[in-house]
Structure formats: C-alpha cells, structure tokens
Amino acid sequence: MAEEIPATASFTPYVHSQTLTSHNRAVSSVKFSSDGRLLASASADKTIRTYTINTINDPIAEPVQEFTGHENGISDVAFSSDARFIVSASDDKTLKLWDVETGSLIKTLIGHTNYAFCVNFNPQSNMIVSGSFDETVRIWDVTTGKCLKVLPAHSDPVTAVDFNRDGSLIVSSSYDGLCRIWDSGTGHCVKTLIDDENPPVSFVRFSPNGKFILVGTLDNTLRLWNISSAKFLKTYTGHVNAQYCISSAFSVTNGKRIVSGSEDNCVHMWELNSKKLLQKLEGHTETVMNVACHPTENLIASGSLDKTVRIWTQKKE
C-alpha cells in the first residue's frame, strides 16, 4: 500500500503496479534508458537484468536479458545515451561494458584497486566516469577501454559520480563529507562543496538543467545545492538514511519532484519547490536502495535489499 499524505489538488498518488523477482540477492541499482524503453537492474547476485518497458501494457516491465560475468556483486549500472551499451561497477574492482541487445560482454575496464562502486556515461557516451572504495574517480575512453585520467578525488570511498548534461563537468561524493565538481576534460577540481557539518555523503547527482546538485547525506537528509553560489537552497527530510548509499532522483514528467529510497522500506516523494512530502510508497520489505524515474511517463522503479524491483505508476483517473 502507498501511505496517503493529504493530497495537494494537483497531485495524483502513485500505486504499486508490478514486482520483478529476477534477482536472488539485494538490488543495488535501477536505471531507465534515456528513451524510457528499457529498465536495467543490478544486484549483489553478480548479475544485471534488463526489461522492456511498455506503459500501455500490463505488465509494464517484461524481462529481456541477463548479463553475467562479474566475479562479485554489482553496485551500479548505467546506460549509454543511445541505450546500446550498459556499464556496470562491481566489488570485483572492475567495470564491464556490455552489449544491451545481445547481453554479451564487450570489454572489462581494469584499474581500480578496491570495489568499483558507482559509474555513469557522459551524454555523448564516449566517456565513462567511475568511483571506487580506492578513493579515486577514474575517467575512461569507451572505444578503447583505456583509463584516461585518475583523479585523487577523496580521502574516503567515493559513493557517486555523475556528468552534467553537456558532459563538461563531473560531480563526485564521498564518505569524507565532500562533493567535488571536476572539469571532465582536464580532470581539475573546479569546486568543492562543503557544508558546516559535513556528514558522509551517500549520493549526488546533477539536476536535469545542470544548475543544481542533489546531495544525500547519512544524517537522513537530502539537500539541493546551487552550483554557482555553492550554497544549499532546499532540504528534504522525512526519510531514513543513516547507513546505506541510497539513490535519489528528479521526477520531471508531472511537476518537479524529488524521489528517494529510504531505510524505512518506503519510496519517498517530495515536491521540489515547497519541500513538502507528497507520498510514501509502501510495499518493499527491506531498505529501498535506489530509485529511477521514467523520462517521459509518470513511472518510478525502485530496488531494494528485499531482492525485488517494484514498478509504481500514478493511479488512473
């Protein structure tokens, strides 16, 4: 059930639509392709799964492909912009690049000296950025699989990495309490965002317009930072995040929202501007580790320690 919070007139609550049970260990990452036609999930069971997404049909998600080859659990997965490739980050210290259609392994990117924890493509999809428990951020050439740059980014494990919308900047976060913004061409640090308290940062991502970053910290808080002023503008609370690196997302298909996983087993959704908690989506039986918002439809995917992926849709009027 989705817990109802008194609705604002314009908000239609989300409801549980489907549960995917392809994985046999915790689900660590869920991502939609940029065209919204595919969903990928990665797991501690060492596999990635893809599903076709058809919002007209029931069920919405249909399993397509299984990707196997990592020697240890997978922490993150990302699609290339054209959805031809997937990259994964694993506790086996490697990244792997996969062919989405065939499920075959294209290449293994070797260089990190500890768990590879987070990964993303740039919008042009000719570069990959990764973060690791070895405290570095690495930039890779997709075509050759070679490491282009090693950034001595942080003094603790790197928890998230993301490119902005034109690929010129990278943001990284770490348990060291810092978010850093890097020039992706030179590898130079152009800005460090520091809060007064600096709790460990569990997640970071650029806003769709690239002007803001959404930062999750292990004090049960999400903050929206303005990059140019290096000040935080808004704070979102009500969820629980004190232990895990839980992802959050921007939902832009029907008003501007912030969506996050939580250690209370719910998906939380806030109105971006008012910071009002709109809804808690109930159904998972363990921590919700990650969420993804569909690019064009009012559709959310969530992955949990309970080994399932859940699909949530807005109630039909």
From Swiss-Prot:
SUPFAM superfamilies: WD40 repeat-like. This is COMPASS-like H3K4 histone methylase component WDR5A. Part of a complex composed of TRO, RBL and WDR5A. This complex is formed during both vegetative and reproductive development. Interacts with SDG14, SDG16, RBL, but not with TRO. Interacts with ATX1 and K4-methylated H3 tails. It comes from Arabidopsis thaliana (Mouse-ear cress). The keyword Nucleus applies. Coiled coil: none annotated. Disruption phenotype: Eearly flowering. Decreased TATA-binding protein (TBP) levels lower Ser5P Pol II levels near the transcription start sites (TSSs) of target genes and of Pol II at the genes 3'-ends thus affecting the transition from transcription initiation to transcription elongation. Significantly reduced trimethylated 'Lys-4' of histone H3 (H3K4me3) levels at the 5'-ends of WRKY70 and LTP7 genes leading to reduced transcript accumulation. One of its GO terms (molecular function) is methyltransferase activity. Keywords: Methyltransferase, Nucleus, Repeat, Transferase, WD repeat. Pfam families: Beta-prop_WDR5. It comes from the Eukaryota. It is found in: Nucleus. Forms multiple COMPASS-like complexes involved in histone methylation by interacting with different histone H3 'Lys-4' methyltransferases such as ATX1, SDG14 or SDG16. Binds to target loci chromatin, increasing H3K4 trimethylation and causing activation of the gene. Up-regulates FLC and MAF4 expression to delay flowering. Present at the promoters and at the transcription start sites (TSS) regions of WRKY70 and LTP7; this occupancy is ATX1-dependent. Involved in the transition from transcription initiation to transcription elongation. GO terms for biological process: methylation; vegetative to reproductive phase transition of meristem. PROSITE patterns: WD_REPEATS_1, WD_REPEATS_2, WD_REPEATS_REGION. GO terms for cellular component: nucleus; Set1C/COMPASS complex.
